[in-house]
A protein has these predicted regions:
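Hinge/lid segment of periplasmic solute-binding proteins
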Residues: 24-30, 95-158
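Aromatic-glycine-rich donor-binding/catalytic loop that engages nucleotide-sugar donors
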Residues: 161-168
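Short, well-ordered beta-strand elements
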Residues: 32-43, 63-68, 89
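Short, low-complexity disordered leader/linker segments with a strong preference
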Residues: 1-36
Length: 168
């Protein structure tokens, strides 16, 4: 799939979610005949939820949407990227894994319009842009991702005084 088409589909996917959530009619490009494949770590029940969201995308755009999840996502996505057979859209559960994929040339940078949308609409927008910007295979920073379904699982609380007192 060409980069331009991927960006159109990505933009349409997120715009159709927002449009239907607010009861508005989708007015993006007609994607009839296009197929969008998404791969991620979600299995039941999240997999069914993602497929329901995909059905909204299909209704809005005319495209076909497929989501596949795997309990060995982290290994499989890297194999797929190296083989050149990755899905159109990939849901990375960790920014570090996305950074590794970018460093091997596996991610397509998103446009400045998507970056501006994040800056304008996400609380602490610049922080989200920074977390979504990774060095490509040439070492150039590229804006590559949009965060959604985020949660905090690895927050560490500590006392700076105790930390310093113990020489950490």
């Amino acid at each position: 799939m060409k980069i331009k088409n991927l960006l159109i589909i990505l933009s349409s996917l997120f715009l159709s979610f927002a449009a239907f959530a607010g009861g508005h009619k989708y007015s993006g490009p007609d994607l009839t005949g296009q197929k969008v494949v998404m791969f991620g770590p979600w299995l039941s029940p999240e997999q069914e939820t993602m497929r329901e969201v995909g059905a909204i995308f299909e209704k809005a755009t005319g495209a076909t949407f497929e989501y596949g999840g795997s309990d060995s996502f982290e290994q499989q996505v890297m194999i797929d990227l190296k083989a050149g057979s990755a899905a159109d859209l990939v849901v990375f559960p960790q920014p570090g894994l996305a950074a590794n994929a970018a460093a091997m040339g596996g991610l397509v940078p998103l446009g400045d319009d998507i970056k501006q949308m994040v800056l304008d609409n996400y609380a602490a927008g610049q922080s989200w842009v920074d977390l979504s910007t990774y060095a490509d295979e040439n070492g150039n920073d590229q804006f590559n991702a949009i965060f959604f379904r985020t949660n905090v699982k690895s927050l560490v609380w500590y006392s700076p005084d105790n930390f310093e007192d113990n020489g950490y």
